């Protein structure tokens, strides 16, 4: 396939699941006005049941998102097929098909951001587990807390802000890495702490999954 068009549209996640569903339907409608569309593929945060095409669990960052039935709503409204998958699973599958995991028998993909998401690709297929919640590694219990509460960008920002005595809103990952390169000791300490926890968490996952390739993604990994 060839990418023909690309757009960025604010999610406004704080407005909740019904808003996101309605926004998605508006986007689909806008494309149908211009051209024929063979189908819709949705990559979404949260725990996704790809067979039912719905979100069955989501964190507090997106209110009222659990239960959102994308597949049913899109197919009923527009009479075209719709598939939905977890966003990290989509990223991992893309890496396995045409990226750094191409040709690997077992690929582990983690995305580091607000939390930590995980995906396991086995022989080119997403491993969903019994109830579509496999590789939710952010909730992995470590000695000092949950994995994503220690090694995510959110955790890094919180640590650095507290170390400086600043409100969290004054910091972000980009600023932390920039100031670390300029010699800010507290920023360097925060990054070292994050990398240490990230390494420990990765090691634990690798003990279980034994991946051939490990891929790290997310905003601060660029």
Which residues make up each language-model segment?
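Residue-level detector of conserved, well-ordered beta-strand and adjacent loop positions
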Residues: 10, 56, 141-143, 217
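Short secondary-structure boundary segments
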Residues: 44, 112, 218-219
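Glycine-rich phosphate-binding loops at beta-strand->alpha-helix junctions
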Residues: 48, 205, 211-222
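Active-site charged/polar residues at nucleotide-handling catalytic sites that mediate phosphoryl
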Residues: 35, 209
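Short histidine/acidic/glycine/proline-rich micro-motifs that form metal-
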Residues: 10-15, 61-62, 146-147, 220-222
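Glycine-rich phosphate-binding loop and adjoining helix at the ATP-binding site
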Residues: 12-13, 17-25, 29, 36-40, ...
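Glycine/GP-enriched mid-protein hinge/lid loop-to-helix segment characteristic of carbohydrate kinases
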Residues: 2-7, 15-19, 75-77, 83-85, ...
């Amino acid at each position: 396939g060839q990418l023909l068009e690309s757009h960025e549209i604010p999610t406004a996640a704080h407005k909740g699941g019904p808003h996101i569903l309605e926004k998605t339907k508006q986007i689909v409608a806008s494309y149908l006005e211009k051209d024929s569309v063979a189908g819709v593929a949705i990559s979404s945060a949260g725990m996704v049941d790809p067979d039912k095409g719905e979100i069955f669990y989501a964190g507090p960052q997106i209110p009222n998102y659990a239960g959102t039935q994308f597949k049913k709503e899109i197919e009923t409204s527009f009479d075209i097929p719709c598939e939905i998958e977890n966003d990290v699973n989509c990223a991992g599958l893309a890496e396995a098909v045409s990226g750094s995991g191409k040709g690997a028998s077992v690929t582990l993909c983690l995305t580091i951001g607000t939390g930590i998401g995980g995906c396991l690709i086995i022989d080119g297929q997403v491993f969903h587990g019994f109830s579509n919640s496999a590789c939710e590694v952010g909730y992995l219990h470590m000695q000092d807390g949950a994995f994503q509460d220690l090694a995510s960008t959110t955790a890094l920002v919180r640590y650095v802000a507290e170390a400086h005595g600043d409100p969290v809103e004054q910091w972000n990952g980009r600023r932390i890495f920039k100031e670390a390169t300029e010699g800010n000791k507290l920023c360097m300490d925060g990054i070292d702490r994050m990398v240490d926890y990230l390494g420990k968490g990765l090691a634990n996952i690798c003990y279980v999954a034994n991946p051939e390739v490990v891929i790290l993604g997310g905003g601060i990994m660029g």
